[in-house]
């Protein structure tokens, strides 16, 4: 590397200042870049075998056919996807899907009209009306959920002291009209009757963490 004396360096700096920085880079940065040492930079081998191999890969498209071969090999492997809706993957016991109201084995409704679910719902999607029973307890006369407001946070299920309102395993409940997503008490109880066995098993599997 050529050694620059002080007068030569000053002259070079003056010429660079008059001509402006080359390609937008200062003389100092160019001088620093010239001292960079590239680590692990490999020069291509120029012997006959290496040159022949590179020419063969280029002319015969060996890399292309190797990639195509790898793609074709996946036709004979087990697929990583499933054929939905004919096949469905497993669901977690904590999955939060369509809502349901549960009953006791005797058929009596679990809900005690405490309205904790209505109070805790951040989306204000639950509306409850209740009346007293002859024995002094309370029963719901109206239990509505606006499913278009629900954010499926699961707070209603966590707040319920008797596991009455739950989010079931069903996630396929799309509708053609808005009105069909306004669930009333009868709809929620029917959901609970339909999925009671699965809901009870999921709650039992998760009881240690509740």
From Swiss-Prot:
[4Fe-4S] cluster 2 binds at residues 121, 150, 153, 156. Belongs to the complex I 23 kDa subunit family. This is NADH dehydrogenase [ubiquinone] iron-sulfur protein 8, mitochondrial. It comes from Pongo abelii (Sumatran orangutan). Core subunit of the mitochondrial membrane respiratory chain NADH dehydrogenase (Complex I) which catalyzes electron transfer from NADH through the respiratory chain, using ubiquinone as an electron acceptor. Essential for the catalytic activity and assembly of complex I. Keywords: 4Fe-4S, Electron transport, Iron, Iron-sulfur, Membrane, Metal-binding, Mitochondrion, Mitochondrion inner membrane, NAD, Oxidoreductase, Repeat, Respiratory chain, Transit peptide, Translocase, Transport, Ubiquinone. Its EC number is 7.1.1.2. Gene3D superfamilies: 3.30.70.3270. InterPro entries: 4Fe4S_Fe-S-bd, 4Fe4S_Fe_S_CS, NADH_quinone_OxRdtase_chainI. One of its GO terms (molecular function) is 4 iron, 4 sulfur cluster binding. Its cofactor is [4Fe-4S] cluster. It catalyses: a ubiquinone + NADH + 5 H(+)(in) = a ubiquinol + NAD(+) + 4 H(+)(out). Residues 1-34 form a transit peptide.
């Amino acid at each position: 590397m050529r050694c620059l004396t002080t007068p030569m360096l000053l002259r070079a700096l003056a010429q660079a200042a008059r001509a402006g920085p080359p390609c937008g880079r200062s003389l100092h940065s160019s001088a620093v870049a010239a001292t960079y040492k590239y680590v692990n930079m490999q020069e291509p081998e120029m012997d006959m075998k290496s040159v022949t191999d590179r020419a063969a890969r280029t002319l015969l498209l060996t890399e292309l056919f190797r990639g195509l071969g790898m793609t074709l090999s996946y036709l004979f492997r087990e697929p990583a996807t499933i054929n939905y809706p004919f096949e469905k993957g497993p669901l977690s016991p904590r999955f939060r899907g369509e809502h349901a109201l549960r009953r006791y084995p005797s058929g009596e409704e679990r809900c005690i009209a405490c309205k904790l679910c209505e109070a805790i719902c951040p989306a204000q999607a639950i509306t409850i009306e209740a009346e007293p029973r002859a024995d002094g307890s309370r029963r719901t006369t109206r239990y509505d959920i606006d499913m278009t407001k629900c954010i499926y946070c699961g707070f209603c299920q966590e707040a319920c002291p008797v596991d009455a309102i739950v989010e079931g395993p069903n996630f396929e409940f799309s509708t053609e009209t808005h009105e069909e997503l306004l669930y009333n008490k009868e709809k929620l109880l029917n959901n609970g009757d339909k999925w009671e066995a699965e809901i009870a098993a999921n709650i039992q599997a998760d009881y240690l963490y509740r």
